[in-house]
Amino acid sequence: MSGTLHGKEKSQEEIEKIIEQTKNSDQKIYPILKPGNWVGLKAGALNSTLIPSEDGAEVVIGYGMDTPDNFVFLTKKHLETMDSKQITQEAFENLANCDTGLEFVEALDNKAVGANGNDFSSETILSRTHMLKAHAMLDAEELLVSIPRRTCMTIISRQTDEEIMNKFVYLHNYTWEDDSFSNAPITNSLFIVKDGNIVEHIPL
């Protein structure tokens, strides 16, 4: 993952509106997973790359805070008053301290764990703290993680049996194709996690 924050300038009017929304805010900053074609990139949202691609990025991490009115993504203008390292450190600390509700998945014979329906369920994959918990729950050295859409995450042991693997991939594909809940898409890939960290991704 690239730790460099990127962002394009917005119009002065847009910048002033966003800065006003977040000025003196005590709202917490969180990382948010987005696909590489996310419109926020053109609008100037700060981001770092999770999965690079030839023409930019396949998956990026945006950074934002929950204001009283809506969720506001940080832009390049925020770097005038906030340090980029401060932003990323605070975002990932807040994620680590967030209760994402990891629990066993009955539909996969309790041989999987998931976090679904919470604001930062999919972002749980970015937290070593939460991934180590998943390792322990599944008693697995290597994990396969599915985060096809926001608020959705399912995890199995990479060494699970064939039946569970097939169900897991089916569930991933079904969720990726299903837009009925309007959950924003992230990526049609599976992630391999070792020792709580992403080490590889498998495009499907």
Short names for language-model regions:
Residues 154-204:
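C-terminal structured domains
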Residues 91, 95, 99, 133-138, ...:
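Hydrophobic, Leu/Ile/Phe/Ala-enriched alpha-helical segments that form helix-helix packing faces
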Residues 1-120:
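Charged, alpha-helical interface segments at or near domain boundaries
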Residues 60-64, 114-116, 146, 156, ...:
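Residues in well-ordered beta-strands of folded domains
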Residues 116-169:
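Intrinsically disordered, low-complexity segments enriched in Gly and acidic/Ser/Thr residues
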Residues 63-65, 123-125, 142, 179-182:
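Aromatic-residue detector
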